């Protein structure tokens, strides 16, 4: 797996978060999701087989209370690793979305820790900082110079709904004839962010694989009558502006859901960068002794 001349062997894994996420609670008992629960155990077996010097893992905060996570810790500790884990708030590390993630680091060389936050509430990156300069597009339109700056079309009814939605508001801002039946019930209170618009001067809500649809969360553009474009979702995940998720030869001929799956399932590159810098810092500290 590693070249023979490798000095330090690092293994990084991220089991699918759906079995542990509160967002996907309704899917947690379907067959595909149940199979994914075993993947952290599989990662533990690979660690025992490969014997890397350093291990890292990322997932949703809910995982830390699950038995599979405790088994994973036990495997690491029994194999001589010093383990540390922490729930981080993504804006603290330059990710412009209200995302909390569980980050784990483990080393055979000794104690290892995650680098401290780089941002604070007074300078968190905001939605405006991240997507404010992108060209305006309509629902269902693709910007001619960037095939990824593409927004899903809206039905006439959903267009009326988003036009009555306010940044940071809820479906309670709508006229009664626009309400879904579910929202008229007491249980409808739990749908507060659905069909909502984001706010310019705050970090965005967590980007999921469903962000191109306004009915899936607070994914409405603050001003334009549409959901976030694929490019906007990618930028909020901290991918570079020129990052390509599809073969350029495809142009605009690709399913929006296919690309949204890649974007929403990704570890934000800036969080990945922090993990990498933390590992480098750990190794540099070892060299000083």
Q: Model-found features: residue ranges?
A:
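Class I S-adenosyl-L-methionine
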Residues: 1-8, 18-194
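Hydrophobic beta-strand segment of the Class I
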Residues: 11-12
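C-terminal target-recognition/interaction regions appended to catalytic cores
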Residues: 153-289
């Amino acid at each position: 797996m590693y070249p023979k001349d490798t000095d330090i062997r690092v293994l990084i894994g991220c089991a699918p978060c759906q079995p542990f996420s509160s967002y996907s609670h309704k899917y947690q008992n379907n067959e595909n999701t149940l199979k994914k629960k075993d993947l952290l155990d599989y990662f533990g077996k690979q660690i025992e087989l490969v014997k890397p010097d350093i291990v890292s893992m990322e997932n949703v905060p809910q995982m830390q209370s699950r038995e599979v996570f405790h088994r994973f810790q036990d495997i690491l500790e029994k194999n001589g690793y010093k383990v540390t884990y922490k729930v981080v708030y993504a804006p603290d590390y330059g990710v412009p979305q209200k995302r909390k993630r569980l980050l784990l680091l483990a080393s055979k060389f000794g104690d290892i820790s995650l680098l401290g936050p780089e941002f604070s509430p007074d300078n968190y990156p905001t939605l405006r900082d991240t997507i404010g300069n992108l060209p305006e597009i309509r629902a269902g339109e693709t910007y001619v110079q960037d095939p990824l700056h593409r927004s899903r079309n809206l039905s006439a009814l959903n267009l009326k709904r988003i036009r009555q939605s306010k940044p940071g508001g809820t479906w309670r801002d709508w006229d009664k004839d626009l309400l879904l039946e579910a929202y008229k019930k007491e249980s409808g209170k739990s749908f507060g962010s659905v069909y909502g618009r984001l706010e310019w001067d705050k970090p965005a809500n967590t980007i999921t694989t469903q962000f191109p649809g306004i009915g899936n969360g607070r994914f409405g553009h603050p001003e334009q009558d549409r959901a976030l474009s694929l490019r906007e979702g990618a930028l909020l995940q901290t991918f570079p502006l020129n990052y390509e998720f599809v073969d350029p030869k495809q142009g605009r001929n690709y399913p929006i859901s296919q690309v949204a799956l890649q974007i929403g399932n990704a570890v934000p590159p800036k969080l990945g960068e922090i993990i990498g810098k933390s590992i480098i810092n750990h190794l540099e500290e070892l060299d000083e002794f």
